[in-house]
Amino acid sequence: EMCIRDSKKMPDIIVEDGVAVRAIKRVYGEVSGDVKHAFEPKDICEIADGKRPGDVEAAKQAFAELGEIAGDAMATAVTLVDGLIVIGGGITAARKYIMPSLLKELRGKMHTITGEELNRVQMKVYDLDNEEEFKEFAKGDQRALKVYGTDRYVAYDPQKRIGVMISKLGASNAISVGAYAFALSQLDAQKQQ
């Protein structure tokens, strides 16, 4: 759980306040100047898409800021944990407004005190929903490595990488699949006792 980590834009505030439903509503209100609006994120996404009247740029910025703050928190998490990032929930309908800033954060740079530039995340970050990036992710940087003392070679892939994707299952299905897999693992564990 990264929810109690500090927020990039508001260091004394928890990150959840920058990535939750209330954040999208708050940022839209602040940027549009309509702080008393009654829009929900679905409405704000429709405004961004031009399907509903409202401030299009404020709507896009609300989702872009969510992506930036989420990307910052995810960059910290993937530094500590090796795994894929799967984003789910209703908010994913606004993917095209969230992902550019989220990926920018994950692919961002940092500097040492002497000015040396480093990647924010040690791994190469791939958008697995992008067909070309998925192919690159799957291919990696495989090369032949000679096994010392033999004539044999093994495949070696030195590329550290991480993938980011939007869940295709939806929250309810993902929970069901996870519960089913857990139940099967528990049954298998009982059989082995």
What do these predicted ranges mean?
Residues K8-Q193:
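ATP-binding/phosphotransfer module of carbohydrate and carboxylate kinases, centering on a glycine-rich
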Residues M2-I4:
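Short, small-residue-biased leader/transition segments that mark boundaries at the very start
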